Design a protein with these regions (language model features):
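N-terminal, charged low-complexity regulatory/assembly segments
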Residues: 1-155
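Hydrophobic packing positions characteristic
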Residues: 102-222
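Short helix-to-turn junction characteristic of helix-turn-helix DNA-binding domains
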Residues: 226-232
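Short acidic, hydrophobic short linear motifs in intrinsically disordered regions
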Residues: 232-242
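Long, positively charged, glycine-interspersed low-complexity recognition regions
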Residues: 246-247
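Short amphipathic alpha-helical interaction segments
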Residues: 250-262
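A short, conserved structural fragment
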Residues: 264-275
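Short, cationic-aromatic polyanion-contact patches
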Residues: 275-281
Length: 281
């Protein structure tokens, strides 16, 4: 199976802290436990989330408050627009803006102090049990958003030491495995109706630090998951799956040998210390 280049989100890995309203201080010399400060923080937070509903906080020039609220909402919205271009193209900018407004109003965006983690919070918002119920939105939207977000997650994942198994093989350290009820890798503007189809996709960085996408069969996805669980111990993974599938471990190892070669060629699987990946003998 051939890895393919996924959609280019153009998302920047900005690690600047997002200014959560609750963290605002009235002055450097004031104690954070003061009741007045706590009340003020709550007023600011409510207004920033719903400026058209909550009353404007007192103690600061209204124009400055409104400018800050607008900047905060626009910054959060810009990160979501950048990370989910395909979702936006398919549901329309107005629908995406409506989702961002609710996401912002509910305050789910400041679960992390880093702007680059806002898209993951937005995916969690779409996947939540109380996610927006709108018949005009496609049922696959949350899964497509997760698929688009995986590119950002892999692109910005830190470099970590390879976890080399006993056979001298290692999985790409930035590897993410996604499982979906819809064929998220084929959804496009030309699709009048998307038919459900169980889909597994491995998303990873190759040796040139390019994000690649590899669509997997259910069996291949189970093998990859077993390799992740067993520290890329190919024999242990085969033994685990063989007992589950009612096969001998050696028999299964022979059946998946071509897959090992393909993953090495795709650089999803690595042989550390070699200039080019080579299949195990």
């Amino acid at each position: 199976m051939t890895a393919r280049q996924g959609p280019n989100n153009g998302q920047q890995a900005d690690t600047a802290p997002a200014p959560a309203p609750e963290a605002l201080q009235a002055g450097a010399g004031q104690a954070s436990s003061a009741p007045g400060l706590t009340r003020m923080q709550g007023d600011w937070s409510s207004y920033f989330r719903q400026p058209g509903v909550a009353p404007r906080p007192t103690g600061m020039e209204p124009r400055r408050i409104d400018v800050y609220a607008s900047l905060l909402r626009n910054n959060i919205g810009s990160f979501i627009h950048q990370c989910f271009p395909l979702c936006e193209a398919l549901i329309g900018t107005s629908n995406l803006e409506a989702l961002i407004d609710r996401f912002f109003a509910e305050g789910r965006w400041h679960t992390s102090p880093f702007f680059h983690e806002i898209p993951k919070a937005f995916v969690d918002f779409l996947q939540a049990e109380d996610a927006p119920a709108d018949e005009s939105l496609p049922p696959w939207l949350a899964e497509l958003a997760h698929y688009e977000w995986l590119e950002l997650a892999v692109e910005t994942a830190p470099d970590v030491p390879l976890r080399v198994g006993p056979q001298g093989l290692a999985l790409c350290p930035a590897l993410q495995l996604g499982g979906y009820a819809y064929p998220v890798h084929t959804i496009g503007a030309e699709d009048a109706e998307v038919v459900p189809a169980t889909t597994f996709v491995a998303v990873y960085r190759d040796r040139q630090h390019q994000v690649r996408f590899n669509v997997l069969t259910p069996a291949a996805a189970q093998l990859l998951d077993a390799l992740q669980d067993n520290g890329c111990d190919w024999q242990a993974a085969c033994e685990q799956l063989a007992s589950h599938w009612g096969l001998a471990a050696d028999e299964l190892a022979g059946q998946v040998a071509p897959l090992q070669q393909q993953w090495l060629a795709d650089e999803l699987l690595l042989r550390p210390g070699t200039a080019q990946p080579a299949a195990a003998g």
